[in-house]
Amino acid sequence: EADTLELFAAQAAAHDSDGVVIMRVLPFTYARDPFRIGGQYRRENLELAEYRAGQIQEACAAVAAPGQTCVATVVDIQIRADAQDPANVAQLGADVDGFYILGGDQTIAMRVIANTPAEAALAAGFAAGAAVGGNSAGAAVLSRYMIGGYTGDNFAWHGLHQGALDLWYGPDDSDQRGLAFGLQEAVVDQHVLERGRTARLIQAMVEKPGDKLAV
């Protein structure tokens, strides 16, 4: 994973124009409920996210050019109200060189972020050249056509069965999709070898809406 973080950090560093590589770490995949969260659970999530931000900052320091400073900070977006909070959205502005989305639950994540000012800010940053990366669920949301998981009691060994997958490719005004600015010609899956997901990735291609590449 260190190599992955360094690759992300290198892309963020390449976007930097003032000697300070600004990266925002986003835990909107962490919640169990997209609309409410307890104070203790929020604090525990923030502690974990801060740890991950430290790893990302270290990865950046390893690849930054001489004279560049790396700053990775967590933006506390965990539920939908957070994604609509102007104070949080302001931290996703034009000065950001990279956005990193943490792992968790991609279906919760899209219910938190879809069609919010925060998603619009991420899209604007991406369009301006900022790096956007993620791991686990944070990688899953990076494709517009998203694998949400399995349906019902289906699991990895049902991956080739039609209807076994929870596939998200609703219209832009829904939350049944990956990020609106995500990869349009590919679908991203994760933990493919560790969790036996090759079959479900193949099935996602069979059921795909239009031509897609599996990543």
Predicted stretch roles:
Residues 69-71, 129, 212:
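A generic structural signal for alpha->beta connector loops
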Residues 207-215:
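Short, intrinsically disordered, charge-balanced linker/junction segments flanking boundaries
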Residues 1-107:
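Extended, subdomain-level signal for the structured scaffold at the beginning of enzyme domains
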Residues 100-101, 132-135, 214-215:
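General beta-strand structural signal in soluble alpha/beta enzymes
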Residues 95, 200-201:
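First exposed extracellular module after export/assembly in secreted or surface-exposed proteins
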Residues 110-198:
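Class I SAM-dependent methyltransferase SAM-binding "motif I" and its flanking Rossmann-like core
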Residues 7, 202-207:
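Short, solvent-exposed amphipathic alpha-helical segments in soluble enzyme
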Residues 14-16, 91-95, 124-127, 179-182, ...:
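Extracellular/periplasmic catalytic domains that process cell-envelope and extracellular macromolecules
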